[in-house]
């Protein structure tokens, strides 16, 4: 007899960018960008954050710009 998995379907995560009707992800909006980076400073993948592919590209570019401008760290401080 095959094993049955516990639990049901997981609820789909809401795209934070689309839900708030944000057209342009500003690299200066550090509070918004912190939702999309880990505690180690890495960009979180789509499956974790729930963003669409288009918005994930916007977020990734904004995070990279903010890192270059010195607004976000490249690596986390231990």
Swiss-Prot record:
PROSITE patterns noted in UniProt: RIBOSOMAL_S18
Gene Ontology terms for molecular function: small ribosomal subunit rRNA binding; structural constituent of ribosome
Keywords, ordered alphabetically: Ribonucleoprotein, Ribosomal protein, RNA-binding, rRNA-binding
UniProt keyword annotation of Nuclease present: no
Disulfide bond sites: none
Subunit structure comment from the entry: Part of the 30S ribosomal subunit. Forms a tight heterodimer with protein bS6.
Protein's recorded name: Small ribosomal subunit protein bS18
Organism in which the protein naturally occurs: Lactobacillus delbrueckii subsp. bulgaricus (strain ATCC BAA-365 / Lb-18)
Encoding gene per record: rpsR
